[in-house]
């Protein structure tokens, strides 16, 4: 996440739009402050125009406006859309409560009747496009509700149906823009962290997380200098942390995975 400034213009080098805005507000609310004093958000609605061979569709998170678009094809398409929305929202709640926000620290945490049953209910065996076809019959609308898997580089024709959560999130929670760009959110987090007594060390490369006896974190190797510590929160990608940062035996890493 960074910003490029040129000739009075600002460009985000990473993501620009925000989905699920409550996640961005939560660190500030949890630390006892009003997030509006740190950053501003603006809802984008409609959040995109989709141009098909036949017409232009304004994609909106306002259900009344969206209903008009679907009903302009056929009333049955709106009924199918509501069935789709109900189905994928129930899967989202299942995934969030039983998988996304749950820690799996051992085999028994996953391999039990309750968890396996919840995994089955996600019904990820069909592709995203096939799942949409069950409820929405018009070709334009099928493509309209399925291309969002491309956000994460997955084809709707081969990716599992669970990725239909992405357009559902857009439609239910809306699409938002942080005023000043996404980098403004990083500055807001920095400000609040420092207010709480935190210290940020800039322009430093973490080379290794030192683990004593393959059991306990004892330090960080930063710019070829050892810094003592007894706990580390690694925000890098998990595979990168395991293969490049964690200084411990490979067989111990396998057990952590």
What are these regions (language model features)?
Residues 116-130, 169-191, 201-203:
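Short beta-strand to alpha-helix junction loop
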Residues 1-93:
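N-terminal glycine-rich phosphate/pyrophosphate-binding loop and immediately adjacent elements
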Residues 159-170:
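Residues forming anionic-ligand binding surfaces in small-molecule and nucleic-acid pockets
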Residues 13, 143-145, 202, 222, ...:
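General beta-strand structural signal in soluble alpha/beta enzymes
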Residues 49, 56, 198-199, 219-220, ...:
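Beta-sheet entry/capping signal
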Residues 53-159:
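Rossmann-like flavin
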Residues 199-218:
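A conserved short coil-to-beta-strand element within the FAD-binding core of flavoproteins
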Residues 179-187, 191, 195, 209-210, ...:
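Glycine-rich loop(s) and the adjacent beta-strand/alpha-helix scaffold that form part
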């Amino acid at each position: 996440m960074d910003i490029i400034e040129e000739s009075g213009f600002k460009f985000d080098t990473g993501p620009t739009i925000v989905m699920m805005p409550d996640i961005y507000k939560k660190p500030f609310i949890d630390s006892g402050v009003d997030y509006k004093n740190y950053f501003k958000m603006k809802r984008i609605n409609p959040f995109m125009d989709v141009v098909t061979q036949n017409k232009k569709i304004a994609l909106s998170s306002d259900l009344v406006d969206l209903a008009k678009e679907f009903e302009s094809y056929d009333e049955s398409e709106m009924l199918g859309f509501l069935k789709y929305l109900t189905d994928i929202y129930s899967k989202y709640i299942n995934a969030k409560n039983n998988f996304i926000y749950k820690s799996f620290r051992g085999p028994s945490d996953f391999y039990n009747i309750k968890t396996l049953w919840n995994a089955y209910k996600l019904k990820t065996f069909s592709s995203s496009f096939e799942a949409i076809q069950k409820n929405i019959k018009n070709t334009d609308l099928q493509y309209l509700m399925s291309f969002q898997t491309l956000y994460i580089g997955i084809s709707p024709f081969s990716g599992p149906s669970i990725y239909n959560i992405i357009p559902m999130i857009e439609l239910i929670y809306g699409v938002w823009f942080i005023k000043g760009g996404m980098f403004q959110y990083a500055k807001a987090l920095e400000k609040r962290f420092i207010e709480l007594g935190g210290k940020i060390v800039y322009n430093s490369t973490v080379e290794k997380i030192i683990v004593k006896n393959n059991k306990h974190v004892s330090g960080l190797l930063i710019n070829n200098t050892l810094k003592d510590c007894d706990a580390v929160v690694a925000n890098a990608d998990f595979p990168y942390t395991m293969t490049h940062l964690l200084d411990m035996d490979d067989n111990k890493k396998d057990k952590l995975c």
